[in-house]
Amino acid sequence: MSMVFAALGALLLCFSPDMGYSARVMAYVGAALMIQLRLLCNLFDGMVAVEGQRFTKSGELFNEVPDRVSDTLLIVALGYALPSLEWAIGVSWLAALLAMMTAYVRLLGASCGLKAEFLGPMAKQQRMAVMTGALLLSAVWHNGAVWLLSGALLVIALGSAWTVGRRLHKIYGLLERS
């Protein structure tokens, strides 16, 4: 279900440049809402698994894959919401790749027998908070939407790169000391 909300949010973002003022404001608010609903689905799924002790051997697949798809849909769509900036689409794909790398590095450390490292500064929750904040501010300050959304995209890309570096450094240190 989280991927459905992410896809709806991504569609709102992708079509927002062709909308009039009022519709674009509603698209920004709607996309922010879809992001939060996507996160709630993820939270409830985890709570059901932990509290109900409903773990399966394939549970991690159903936890991780939808997150990666959802992140990619939303982050890439943010670039497509900025057609006036020729670099935005490329940066959105880079940001999505770096976001995926944060999860990859975390899982790589776990596959080496270490505890999963959820170090930030730009883990999933922070990426989605940056997007949500930028979308809601853009709905209020429409003239600044391009700056707010492109700023969010850059923050997500740079923050994700920093997060990958921090996680790799921590995992390297733990492996060398073990």
Language model segments and positions:
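Hydrophobic alpha-helical transmembrane segments
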Residues: M1-A32, L73-S178
